[in-house]
From Swiss-Prot:
Zn(2+) binds at residues 31, 34, 50, 53. InterPro entries: Ribosomal_eS31, Ribosomal_eS31_arc, Ribosomal_zn-bd. Binds 1 zinc ion per subunit. SMART domains: Ribosomal_S27 (SM01402). It comes from the Archaea. This is Small ribosomal subunit protein eS31. Its cofactor is Zn(2+). Belongs to the eukaryotic ribosomal protein eS31 family. Part of the 30S ribosomal subunit. The gene is rps27ae. Signal peptide: none annotated. HAMAP family: Ribosomal_eS31.
């Protein structure tokens, strides 16, 4: 039989937990078009991208 693989949890990368206040907050943004979690990319241009529907927001630097 094949050996069972242990799953690596990455929930701590997606959410911030404040135990004192009892609040769980999402670190990343949600897509305004479909509501799924967006990915933050730094290269070649900083942007937020939704892998589900293809929506992209480019980050503009304010001077």
């Amino acid at each position: 039989m094949a050996e069972k693989k242990e799953l690596k949890t990455y929930v701590h990368k997606l959410y911030e937990v404040d135990y004192e206040k009892g609040v769980i907050k999402l670190k990343n943004r949600r897509c305004p078009r479909c509501g799924s979690i967006m990915a933050h990319h730094m290269k070649p241009v900083e942007r937020w991208h939704c892998g589900k529907c293809g929506y992209t927001e480019f980050v503009t630097k304010k001077k």
